Amino acid sequence: NSDHKIFFAWMNYSPATSSMQTRLRGIPDSLDIVSFFTGYVNNKQNREDVKFLQERRGTKVLLTMWPDKYFATTGEGREDLDSMIVYAENLVDSIYTWGLDGFDLDYEPSFGGDSYTTEMMRTFIDVMSKYLGPKCDEQYKVNGKHKLLVVDGQWNDAEYADRFDYFIGQAYNASSESSLNNRCQDGWQDYGKGFPNEKRIFCEWVSQVGNAFGQGGVNYRYDNEYIPSLWGMAHYAVESPKNVAGCGAYVLQFGYAEGNHLNLPVPPNNYYYARQAIQIMNPAGKTVEDETDGEEVEVEE
């Protein structure tokens, strides 16, 4: 592995406005992986923005989805494996057709989300990991590289963790190194069972007006002072012996302007706190190798 650390972000993407706050191409140019959190609309503007990031910046663009509601977790439909296979195959087909770089599974069974049986979830992942992720079939790799398969929120099946490239930990409101240590492998808040620390990315949240991310997150204790928690996560990624993969943000566009509001002044740079976190992890001028094994896909106009 190189010393490069990953910056990941979810984005509620809306191409209906010219504002760079809601345009995909307005994100920081050193951001490694961005995922459509609110779905993807296959239109010309979206295709152009995705292709721009892939070809001009090397950013990997994913789709975030969660197990569909029509797969029951209780009752008669809870073991409908055939339907799960069809759903997974259709999802993969869409990712390839749209020219995206992979898939992010949003799964939070202990936090109000649906909890599928082990067999149901393994059936889903067996299909997805045939085409995506480190275990994908050789025929679906391009120049030895594969599309990404990541999971965020919670993963309890340690035996299947090796099907994923990364576990995205929702380490919201982290206030210290110890709070992040707790979320590492075998910690008491280890929500990514089976994932080594070097495959974990910790994220801060920016999902609503008025939360602390307009100032980079909550106060984080670092080197006898307080800094924004996103910067604390960045320092943790490069300085902690846990050697996690990086850091990131949930709903990035709310961190575009100071105070999480569209009409407030933008700090010295748009996405100021995100850009500084990237700089902490990967200082400008540092030469690194690409670790995000996604393939480039030609997109039709």
Give the label of every model feature segment.
Residues 1-301:
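Secreted glycan hydrolases and related glycan-binding modules that recognize and/or cleave
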